[in-house]
């Protein structure tokens, strides 16, 4: 069993059970340990003994026996002590509850239960109520035997402090269990939703380039042949370090290459720089500083972007008709 956050609580609860056993093993069950002693009379949880003569195990003391052998020397009356003696049965009841808490703390060391905060809540609740029960049992011991109280009665008080420390340790163990549960849920979620780099480890052979014609059925055997219409030579004539211009296609009936159809880039007209940033209006209208007029500018919409306008088509029907109208016709009727 691994050492967990509930291990200190388990050790303290075992010590508390030992103290409860010492407090219960009193007359008439054992003659050596006593909760209270007056002369030759020794009192325990379930009875009393006079020298070697002990009473039968019972709940509560006989009032006649107290009047005869233990009437004087106590701070409380015989009636109060006789009624309070019935409350001594709370000591074994508190010991049984402490035993239940100890068994549950042992189960708290199991992997699944160790991550359950609710399980620690149950143990803490049982221990919390047992603290009050043990405290009541000690008060009854004081009322019954003071000032002749013996050290086994003080063990009941020690169990009150031990169980109080156990309660604080259970709160710490519950906090640790909450963290373990959250960590376990994160691992489970990341394993199902997250990317696992080892998921393709066993299927890495799908990327192998080895031939699989031997283990494939006949209907799945295939072969890829070069099509007949593919007449392009594999050797394009371009060697490493050669010029890329060799790959530019040209027309058979035209000596112009594709580079001749590329649009010409107009260089901007250089504007002379003035010495100062401020210029007068008459200095801004110099012809040298004016940009050339854009031939593609629309006079009706001068602020329109010429790039968005369609390029002029010199082979349109309207332009062809306009050019034909401008040329003089050579057709004549009759002979010249």
Curated annotation (Swiss-Prot):
Keywords: Cytoplasm, Meiosis. It is found in: Cytoplasm. GO terms for biological process: meiotic cell cycle. Pfam families: SUR7 (PF06687). The keyword Cytoplasm applies. It comes from the Eukaryota. Residues 250-262 have a biased composition (Polar residues). GO terms for cellular component: cell division site; cell tip; cytoplasm; endocytic vesicle; exocytic vesicle; growing cell tip; plasma membrane; plasma membrane of cell tip. Has a role in meiosis. This is Meiotically up-regulated gene 33 protein. The lineage of its organism: Eukaryota, Fungi, Dikarya, Ascomycota, Taphrinomycotina.
């Amino acid at each position: 069993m691994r050492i967990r956050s509930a291990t200190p609580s388990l050790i303290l609860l075992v010590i508390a059970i030992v103290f409860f056993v010492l407090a219960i093993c009193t007359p008439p069950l054992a003659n050596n340990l006593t909760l209270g002693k007056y002369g030759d009379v020794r009192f325990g949880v379930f009875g009393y003994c006079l020298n070697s003569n002990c009473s039968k195990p019972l709940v509560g003391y006989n009032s006649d026996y107290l009047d005869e052998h233990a009437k004087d020397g106590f701070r409380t009356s015989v009636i109060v002590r006789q009624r309070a003696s019935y409350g001594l049965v709370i000591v074994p009841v508190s010991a049984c509850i402490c035993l239940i808490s100890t068994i549950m703390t042992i189960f708290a060391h199991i992997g699944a239960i160790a991550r359950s905060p609710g399980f620690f809540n149950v143990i803490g609740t049982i221990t919390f109520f047992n603290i009050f029960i043990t405290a009541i049992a000690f008060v009854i011991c004081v009322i019954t035997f003071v000032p002749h109280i013996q050290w086994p009665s003080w063990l009941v008080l020690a169990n009150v402090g031990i169980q109080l420390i156990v309660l604080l340790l259970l709160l710490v163990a519950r906090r640790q269990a909450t963290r373990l549960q959250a960590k376990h849920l994160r691992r489970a979620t990341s394993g199902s939703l997250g990317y696992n780099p080892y998921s393709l480890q066993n299927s890495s052979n799908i990327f192998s380039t080895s031939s699989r014609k031997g283990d494939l059925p006949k209907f799945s055997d295939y072969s890829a042949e070069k099509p007949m219409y593919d007449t392009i030579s594999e050797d394009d004539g371009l060697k490493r370090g050669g010029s890329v211009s060799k790959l530019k296609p040209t027309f058979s009936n035209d000596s112009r290459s594709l580079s001749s159809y590329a649009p010409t880039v107009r260089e901007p007209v250089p504007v002379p720089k003035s010495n100062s940033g401020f210029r007068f209006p008459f200095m801004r209208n110099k012809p040298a500083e004016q940009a050339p007029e854009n031939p593609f500018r629309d006079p009706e919409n001068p602020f329109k972007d010429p790039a968005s306008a369609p390029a002029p088509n010199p082979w349109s029907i309207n332009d062809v008709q306009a050019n034909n109208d401008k040329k003089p016709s050579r057709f004549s009727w009759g002979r010249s």
